[in-house]
Regions:
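Glycosyltransferase-associated regions of secretory-pathway enzymes
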Residues: 1-39, 54-200
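Small-residue hinge/turn detector
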Residues: 39-51
Length: 200
């Protein structure tokens, strides 16, 4: 891995899940994608260690406190329902948090991975487990991290502005690729360009 920022520790992912366990989607828009495996990896990481897991396509805009036993971000789906999503998850280490992650790992182990499609073991599974384990009080509102939905990624480049209370932004990389959004060419006023000026 190149261009690793200073202060970042690079560790061997085989400690969490061995390389032999890597799998990809075999169908759907994200065919060949690793995001399903990434979900399994994060659930195993949280089960074993607890802590904070953040996708690489989330940009943090402000500091925020990890002062609760869990933190889940949420998004609006296409019909306007708020659902927990797994782009950023915080789970305090300890036995009380292990059940939700063991349930997630059990669910994935029972699935036929050749038939899975994007989202099934990510937001869909996580949202059902948050409800099952009565953890909805730890779910942040969508505007804080996912003010732009995965189905409206054109807003990243059309001049749409982030809400003032946004803590971060999920760039929805898998869908951005699908929608042919080239993050190297974008209007000056776009969210992408503003992020570039601020952080690059």
């Amino acid at each position: 891995v190149k261009n690793i920022p200073s202060g970042v520790n690079v560790l061997d992912g085989n400690v969490i899940l061995p390389k032999s366990r890597i799998w990809t989607y075999q169908q759907g828009f994200n065919k060949g994608g690793l995001s399903g495996y990434s979900c399994e990896f994060r659930y195993k990481f949280l089960y074993e260690y607890g802590g904070l897991f953040v996708d690489t396509d989330i940009v943090l805009l402000k500091d925020f406190n990890l002062d609760k036993p869990y933190i889940f971000i949420s998004e609006l789906n296409e019909v306007g329902n708020v659902i927990a999503t797994n782009g950023l998850i915080y789970s305090q280490s300890g036995t009380s948090s292990e059940k939700i992650w063991s349930d997630a790992l059990d669910d994935i182990s029972y699935r036929n991975k050749a038939r899975l499609i994007h989202g099934e073991v990510g937001p869909i599974l996580l949202n059902s487990l948050v409800n099952k384990h009565k953890l909805k009080k730890y779910v942040l509102q969508p505007n804080l991290f996912c003010s732009i939905g995965w189905f409206e990624t054109e807003k990243l480049i059309d001049g749409t502005q982030l809400p003032n209370d946004a803590i971060g932004i999920h760039l929805c990389d898998a869908k951005s690729k699908l929608n042919d959004i080239d993050k190297k060419t974008f209007p000056h006023v776009s969210i992408i360009e503003q992020l570039k000026r601020k952080y690059l």
